[in-house]
Amino acid sequence: MTRIKRGSIARRRRTKAHSFASKFREAHARLTRAITQQQIRALFSADRDRDKQKIDFRRLWITRINALIREKGVFHNYSKFINDLYKSQLLLNRKILAQIAISNRNCLYMIANEIIKKVGFESAVII
């Protein structure tokens, strides 16, 4: 059986790994075996944190909406507001509502008043 020399292929693979790990510190940026381990760990963390980021942003949007709703006393709480939002068939998601809450509060109050008109006064409290 003939010998297969793969120096250039292995070097190309290691160079690619070294360029990925160029911002790592100490041995994690220099040693090939440590680089491969850190590369696996970094890609795993990136995949996990992409899912966590979605959860964190949703939590942030809910907090912003809830704070603004309770501030003026438009509704008692966030869950009642969202429930009445879906009952009145207004198709606004949490991200858009949070952006409206930050940029234009009066617009969110107008949305809340529309919900109150459609659903009724028994579910909301107006101050």
UniProtKB/Swiss-Prot annotation:
GO-annotated biological processes: ribosomal large subunit assembly; translation
GO CC terms, sorted: chloroplast; ribonucleoprotein complex; ribosome
Gene Ontology MF term list: rRNA binding; structural constituent of ribosome
Source organism superkingdom: Eukaryota
Pfam families named among the record's database cross-references: Ribosomal_L20
Compartments, as annotated in UniProt: Plastid, Chloroplast
Role this protein plays: Binds directly to 23S ribosomal RNA and is necessary for the in vitro assembly process of the 50S ribosomal subunit. It is not involved in the protein synthesizing functions of that subunit.
Signal peptide: none
Record protein name field: Large ribosomal subunit protein bL20c
Keyword Glycoprotein: no
